[in-house]
Regions:
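Short acidic loop-to-beta-strand element that houses the catalytic metal-binding Asp/Glu
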Residues: 1
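Accessory terminal alpha-helical modules
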Residues: 6-515
Length: 515
């Protein structure tokens, strides 16, 4: 575990040679730790708790780098084969582990990219990919009315088996699908405790079924006579029956393969805890009494299409419930309509926050109240800049012969991603040139000190300046902007009110780009 409280950029780069050396021969590094006098306490702990059960070759070694300050993508790309434990991820696992206790280990193992088959007792198994079988039924698309290739399987599963394999796309979690927002909320401690009390007192299952998604590459299906059903990459079963049929469902024993769409609280109520209910729930955890309805999607489906399908399903289940907030519905609508200006703008904000001059400046998580809020930047800054029309839009500037296809109803994820990347690069170039002419003391969030200039108003002013540049054919690269913004030193940012984005943008344009 490597951690720092200072600026991680130079600190991380200085560690690259050491990290590469460790990763090149992990066994040799373990020997070094155990043989050196400086690590005698570590050696004692290893001998007492680990080496009496496992060999050194069975030890998995991961370099974990923790910094409270966010590390930009440009530095992560230089120092690879390191697990970056960002502060937001620390906060996430802190919340999750307080609620579901030891059961949080499965998700943490997945975050560390540890091989599930090489952890604990799994190492001793002779089978390379252990599986478990569950009795159930297959409902083909003719009966479910889902699109071709999507099957519904229902089966009973014990909570222990489900929790080992499950994942939930929580919006404050660590999973990152790049172009797709995540939407499910964090677990609610009060709700989990109430459900555990119910399980303890009633000693019976919840009557509702758990809705999940599965990929056909992680399961095998057998008919009632235990004959293997062949599922091709498009999700079609060669020996298909158009009626519901009994089946044996064999699922790999791997983490992160069953996505819980509805029922995360009912599932995680069975977690491995330390409360007064654990003795009862421990017995229930291994009983196959959870009714699971799984949507089996084809192996050849793209990640974006799969996540859109899951989001639509989640919205259909939760839209009429009291707890479905407008922000949740908006997030899912952005997933279902990725070509919308709001969805594109939110993606741009995320990318600007990951690297460049605005690294870690935007509010992303519930505890980041001291950072820049993004709602007004999305609505009044980015949306007019990235719209698919107008003489002042990045769409006009984008030199792509296929760009008109984005106006069609059919999704083109690759083309859309190219446009998003273009927008991010153009905005970042402007910011690089601008920030090069601002002192470090002033390039800070304005709420923290009187001389700082970073605020919603300033960022929207710069975005509006870029619109003027596009309209007047005065755009360029970061070096061009750096030269032009040399005139910005005497600009009075504080004289503009919070709603005067356009006025500030025009003033910056005239000050720095008009001879």
């Amino acid at each position: 575990m490597e951690y720092t409280i200072g600026d991680p950029s130079s600190h991380l780069l200085n560690k690259k040679i050491f990290y590469d050396k460790v990763n090149s021969d992990k066994l040799k590094f373990i020997d070094f730790l155990l043989e050196g006098n400086a690590f005698s306490s570590l050696k004692t702990s290893f001998e007492e708790n680990i080496l009496n059960n496992y060999s050194k070759r069975e030890i998995q070694l991961v370099i974990v780098y923790a910094s409270k300050k966010k590390i930009g993508d440009e530095h992560r790309n230089l120092v690879q084969n390191v697990c970056y434990l960002d502060y937001s991820i620390v906060k996430y696992f802190q919340v999750i582990s307080k609620i579901i206790k030891k059961s949080a280990k499965y998700e943490f193992f997945d975050f560390l990219k540890l091989d599930f088959d090489k952890i604990g007792e799994s190492i001793k198994r002779s089978s390379l990919t252990p599986t478990e079988q569950f009795q159930g039924h297959i409902l083909p698309e003719e009966r479910s009315c889902f699109q071709a290739g999507f099957k519904i399987v229902t089966f009973y599963m014990d909570a222990n088996a489900l929790l080992k394999r499950a994942y939930v796309l929580r919006n404050d979690g660590w999973r990152n699908f790049g172009n797709v927002e995540l939407y499910q909320r964090l677990l609610i401690s009060k709700k989990i405790k109430a459900m555990r009390k119910y399980l303890h007192e009633q000693s019976r299952v919840f009557v509702n079924n758990i809705i999940v998604t599965l990929s056909s590459k992680h399961i095998k299906l057998y008919d009632k006579d235990k004959n293997l059903l062949t599922v091709d990459s498009s999700g079609c079963i060669k020996e298909a029956d158009t009626k519901a049929q009994p089946a044996l469902i064999e699922i790999e024993n791997k983490p992160n393969i069953i996505g819980i769409i509805d029922g995360q609280h009912r599932s995680y109520a069975y977690h491995e805890g330390d409360d007064v209910y654990e003795e009862t729930i421990q017995k229930l955890r291994t009983i196959q009494n959870l009714l699971v309805t799984g949507i089996l999607y084809p192996e050849n489906i793209t990640t974006e299409a799969r996540l859109r399908f899951e989001a639509k399903l989640f919205l259909e289940i939760n839209a009429t419930q009291q707890g479905a907030s407008s922000s949740l519905k908006q997030t899912i609508e952005n997933i279902l309509n990725p070509n919308s200006s709001t969805a594109i703008a939110k993606h741009i904000i995320t990318k600007l926050n990951e690297s460049g001059p605005l690294l870690d400046k935007f509010e992303e998580h519930w505890y980041e109240s001291d950072k820049i809020k993004t709602a007004s930047i999305i609505s009044f800054g980015l949306k007019p800049l990235i719209k698919f029309s107008g003489s002042d839009s990045l769409f006009k500037l984008w030199n792509n012969s296929q760009k008109e296809k984005l106006l069609e109803k059919e999704f083109n994820d690759q083309l859309l991603n190219e446009y998003k990347e273009f927008c991010v690069n153009e905005i970042r170039n402007l910011l690089i040139g601008f920030s090069a002419n601002i002192t470090k003391e002033n390039w800070a969030i304005s709420r923290k000190n009187s001389t700082a200039i970073l605020s919603v108003t300033t960022i929207n002013g710069l975005i509006n300046c870029l619109r003027f540049l596009i309209e007047n054919n005065k755009t360029g690269d970061s070096n061009y902007y750096r030269k032009c913004f040399e005139k910005i030193s005497g600009f009075n940012f504080k004289s503009f009110k919070s709603s005067q984005y356009r006025k500030m943008g025009e003033s910056i344009y005239k000050e720095c780009f008009i001879e």
